[in-house]
């Protein structure tokens, strides 16, 4: 296990102390060499804003759980946990872009967490998966894309793909059912404020309730399509 990995409390203690329904959010983050410099600096700052915004929301701080899988190489940087124990890792740019393997690793991590919820009698909202990349995959990705499409069709999770400048939007379109979003400039902080607000709204709803989200692809928003 990497020294940067963070593990939540085990043995169901976390659920005994906090039996609130959970809203899991999985971040799949490109840490390949092309993200070096300002892109990764802004992404790191955005994740810290995300943590701070969630911490300031009483309900979200109890219900939203965050996990991070970085690629490449593929590594679980933070296991699912609520924001009171979530200390964002500082991402470093190395390697290539094994996006397919990262997606499959993330889906397996999410499945494990859902099993833990069920085993401990914890209700949970439909999970959110956010993929952020500035390039194209350097590994086999079609199996991962198929898993995302089938998972979304079965309502196992909601999948969002965000392309930074240089991203292969044509490939991102193969993942899931939503049109991928293109990040304007390097507005990661705006993205994560939107994400925290959206998850905050979800966490205040009933588990099976549909929540209307603010469209991020408006002229004033952080994304374009």
Annotate each language-model stretch with its function.
Residues 43-56:
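An active-site-proximal "capping" alpha-helix that borders the catalytic cofactor pocket
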Residues 32, 50, 137, 141-150:
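Mixed-charge (Asp/Glu-Lys/Arg
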Residues 29-32, 43, 68, 106, ...:
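DG-centered beta-turn motif at the end of beta-strands
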Residues 86-125, 139-140, 158-172, 183-194:
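Von Willebrand factor
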Residues 62-90, 169-175:
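Short beta-strand-loop
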Residues 10-19, 61, 122, 147-157, ...:
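P/S/T/G-enriched low-complexity
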């Amino acid at each position: 296990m990497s020294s940067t990995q963070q593990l939540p409390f085990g043995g169901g203690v976390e659920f005994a102390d906090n039996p609130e329904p959970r809203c899991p959010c999985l971040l799949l983050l490109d840490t390949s060499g092309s993200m070096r410099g300002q892109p990764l600096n802004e992404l790191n700052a955005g994740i810290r804003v995300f943590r701070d915004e969630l911490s300031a929301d009483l309900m979200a701080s109890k219900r939203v759980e965050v996990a991070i899988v970085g690629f490449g190489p593929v590594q679980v940087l933070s296991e699912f946990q609520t924001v009171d124990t979530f200390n964002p890792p500082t991402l470093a740019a190395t390697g290539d872009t094994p996006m397919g393997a990262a997606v499959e690793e993330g889906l397996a991590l999410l499945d494990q967490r859902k099993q833990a919820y069920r085993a401990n009698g914890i209700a949970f909202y439909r999970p959110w998966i956010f993929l952020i990349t500035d390039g194209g995959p350097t590994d086999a990705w079609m199996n991962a894309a198929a898993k995302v499409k089938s998972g979304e069709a079965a309502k196992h999770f909601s999948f969002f793909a965000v392309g930074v400048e240089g991203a292969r939007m044509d490939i991102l379109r193969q993942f899931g059912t939503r049109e991928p979003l293109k990040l304007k400039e390097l507005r990661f902080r705006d993205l994560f404020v939107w994400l925290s607000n959206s998850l905050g709204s979800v966490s205040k709803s009933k588990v099976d309730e549909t929540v209307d989200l603010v469209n991020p692809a408006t002229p004033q928003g952080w994304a374009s399509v």
